[in-house]
Amino acid sequence: MVRLNVKPTRMELNNLKERLKTAERGHKLLKDKRDELMRRFISLIRENNRLRKEVESYLIDNLKSFAVAKSLKNSLMVEELFSIPSKEIELFIEKENIMSVTVPRMHMNITSQNENSEYSYLSSNSEMDDVFATMNSLIDKLLRLAEVEKTCQLMADEIEKTRRRVNGLEYSIIPNLSETIHYIELKLEEAERANLVRIMKVK
């Protein structure tokens, strides 16, 4: 603890007591914020882990399926299947405030880009059709995964900042204020006793 460099006066004592009350209120609010952020963060981490495992599993299986599907077609035909994008994806990113943390909210609009796309169920095979269907179903999960991962990163940063502020109040500001208040109270009591002794001597 470090005693603040202030004059031991009653006015200063009152000011320090007000500062201590404010610091203690701020400490409680920040602790509550930190705890709620942690609760939400843990929930998001669980969702993130679940989504990541799910997406990775789908991608691994899909790559295997694609290798099989590709082996059943000649290379030129496979190139033709992928030569023109069949869909256009517009990505929209909005902002949402969660406990003073600005996090992204993503959604998309998918439209057919070319009705006469090279990809055709006639020129393809059932294996390749399954690959396309799986990849299309994965888009929403990939978007949600990106959203959750970014939110986790931003919330982790805010938790760390809040933790530092809580610790600063708990281990530095509040103890220093308390120590200084105690010191001033002792000094004022000493002054009162000294004054009382002088009065008694005069009498």
Curated annotation (Swiss-Prot):
Gene Ontology molecular function: any one: proton-transporting ATP synthase activity, rotational mechanism
Any Pfam family hit: ATP-synt_D
Domain of life: Bacteria
GO biological process terms, semicolon-separated: proton motive force-driven plasma membrane ATP synthesis
Keywords from the UniProt entry: ATP synthesis, Hydrogen ion transport, Ion transport, Transport
PANTHER family: V-TYPE ATP SYNTHASE SUBUNIT D
Protein family (similarity comment): Belongs to the V-ATPase D subunit family.
Summary of the function given for this chain in its UniProt record: Produces ATP from ADP in the presence of a proton gradient across the membrane.
Protein name per its UniProtKB record: V-type ATP synthase subunit D
Native organism: Streptococcus pneumoniae (strain CGSP14)
